[in-house]
């Protein structure tokens, strides 16, 4: 089996055989398929197995694998540019496109990952407000920056540890943890620390404790508290941006953040991130202001070209989001019916083209505490069952399942057929 052979050899040269922990399939537990290629809604491993892909590279591949327009943009650009570390026209084009098609971004700074975007956004908020503390929420994941690894979601959550070794206590002393979807908890924190709170950073749709949409009163309450105390509201839309809607979850909720972080979809499948917001805030970044942030590969021309091709295609085809919502509704309705018919305790949370299946007897999953009660042993069996039937979902109870525009009703039917035989 080439998959197993390649993975075993990978362990000799990469910790755990992977470059990101969840790829090791530790929680399932299986050896992961080693992916060779992808086309449209499908991926193929080194053993020749075909899977309908509902991971979509953890979100970015909303257009499907190897979309022709994105591939052509990469090919065309790479004939003349790989990297300059200098100003290019294509970075202007993508920056301008985002600023003119998004409602709440007046200026933007390109970086190379979601982690870079969120850590830079927090630094900017601290520099702008001249305050130290930030508020984040249990189970919300904002990357592996030390200040965020207090109570994180996803793989950290699965392993049942609150943070990470190697993070000094001093790094997290200014990070205050609140319960997601609990506005009273945040009010109490502001009553105590409001005068030194630089920002709230929040996923409007949480994706790394499973998908948990923020409640409208909760998110609006955060906006109001930030206004009252002079703190900034940072929406981490690394996962939800350009996915739940082109303009992100903030457009669905009608809430205006001060800073928005983006990544995943905006890079068209290449390493990319960005943060943007009000001009008066963004102008605090060097070289205009005192907040220093830099990057050799930031604004890489090939990445910018892939991102521009992706966002133009999404923005110019609003029917894509209509299709994704239709498929999402069908999948959600079908799984709920199977759960009822077979008496399998499940909660299905969905926002647009991202959703999660929680194996729990609770009636809802609204925060980290609820998510932790889910049965990961049953999920591991479910994952193996789905993989054996050619359905590729994330190997963790606490990761999202994603749709892309190349998925069809037939693919949804196959997903539901597999669930029905579990």
Curated annotation (Swiss-Prot):
InterPro entries, alphabetically?
Answer: 4pyrrol_synth_GluAld_NH2Trfase, Aminotrans_3, Aminotrans_3_PPA_site, PyrdxlP-dep_Trfase, PyrdxlP-dep_Trfase_major, PyrdxlP-dep_Trfase_small
Q: Which GO terms describe its molecular function?
A: glutamate-1-semialdehyde 2,1-aminomutase activity; pyridoxal phosphate binding; transaminase activity
**What does this protein need as cofactor?**
pyridoxal 5'-phosphate
| Predominant location | cytoplasm
EC numbers listed for it are: 5.4.3.8
- Identify the domain of life: Bacteria
Give the metabolic or biological pathway. Porphyrin-containing compound metabolism; protoporphyrin-IX biosynthesis; 5-aminolevulinate from L-glutamyl-tRNA(Glu): step 2/2
PROSITE patterns assigned to the protein according to its UniProt record, in alphabetical order? AA_TRANSFER_CLASS_3
Q: What is the top EC class of this enzyme, as a single word?
A: isomerase
Q: Which residues form a coiled coil?
A: none
What is the name of the protein in this document? Answer: Glutamate-1-semialdehyde 2,1-aminomutase
UniProt keywords, alphabetically: Cytoplasm, Isomerase, Porphyrin biosynthesis, Pyridoxal phosphate
Q: Which Pfam families match?
A: Aminotran_3 (PF00202)
What family classification does the UniProt entry report for this protein? Belongs to the class-III pyridoxal-phosphate-dependent aminotransferase family. HemL subfamily.
Example of a GO biological process term: protoporphyrinogen IX biosynthetic process
The reply on keyword Cytoplasm is: yes
Catalytic activity annotated for this protein? (S)-4-amino-5-oxopentanoate = 5-aminolevulinate
One of the record's GO cellular component terms: cytoplasm
Subcellular location field: Cytoplasm
Please give the subunit comment from the record.
Homodimer.
Q: Give the modified residues of type N6-(pyridoxal phosphate)lysine.
A: 264
């Amino acid at each position: 089996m080439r998959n197993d052979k390649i993975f075993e050899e990978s362990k000799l040269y990469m910790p755990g055989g992977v470059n990101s922990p969840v790829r090791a399939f530790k929680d399932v537990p299986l050896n992961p398929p080693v992916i060779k290629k992808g086309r449209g809604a499908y991926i193929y491993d080194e053993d020749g197995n075909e899977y309908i892909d509902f991971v979509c590279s953890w979100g970015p591949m909303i257009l499907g694998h190897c979309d022709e327009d994105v591939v052509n943009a990469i090919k065309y650009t790479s004939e003349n540019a790989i990297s300059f570390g200098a100003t290019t026209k294509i970075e202007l084009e993508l920056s301008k496109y985002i600023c003119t098609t998004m409602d709440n971004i007046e200026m933007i700074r390109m970086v190379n990952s979601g982690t870079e975007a969120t850590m830079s956004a927090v630094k900017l908020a601290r520099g702008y407000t001249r305050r130290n503390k930030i508020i984040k929420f249990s189970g919300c994941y904002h990357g592996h920056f030390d200040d965020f690894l207090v109570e994180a979601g996803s793989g950290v959550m699965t392993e049942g540890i609150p943070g990470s070794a190697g993070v000094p206590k001093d790094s997290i002393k200014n990070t205050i943890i609140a319960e997601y979807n609990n506005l009273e908890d945040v009010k109490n924190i502001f009553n105590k620390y409001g005068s030194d709170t630089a920002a709230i950073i929040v996923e409007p749709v949480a994706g790394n404790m499973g998908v948990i949409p923020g409640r409208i009163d909760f998110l609006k309450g955060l906006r109001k508290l930030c206004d009252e105390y002079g703190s900034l509201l940072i929406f981490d839309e690394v996962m939800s941006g350009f996915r739940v809607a082109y303009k992100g979850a903030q457009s669905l909720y009608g809430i205006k953040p001060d800073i928005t972080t983006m990544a995943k979809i905006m890079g068209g499948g290449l390493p990319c991130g960005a943060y943007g917001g009000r001009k008066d805030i963004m102008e605090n970044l060097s070289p205009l202001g005192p907040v220093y942030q830099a990057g050799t590969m930031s604004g890489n021309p090939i990445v910018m070209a892939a991102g521009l091709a992706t966002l133009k295609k999404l923005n110019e085809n609003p029917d894509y989001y209509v299709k994704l919502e239709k498929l999402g509704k069908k999948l959600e309705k079908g799984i709920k019916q199977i759960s009822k018919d077979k008496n399998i305790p499940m909660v299905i949370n969905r926002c647009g083209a991202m959703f999660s299946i929680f194996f729990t007897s609770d009636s809802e999953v609204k925060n980290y505490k609820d998510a932790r009660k889910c049965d990961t042993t049953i999920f591991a069996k479910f994952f193996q069952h789905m993989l054996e039937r050619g359905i590729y979902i994330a190997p963790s109870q606490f990761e999202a399942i994603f749709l892309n525009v190349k998925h069809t009703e037939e693919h949804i039917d196959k997903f539901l057929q597999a669930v029905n035989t579990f």
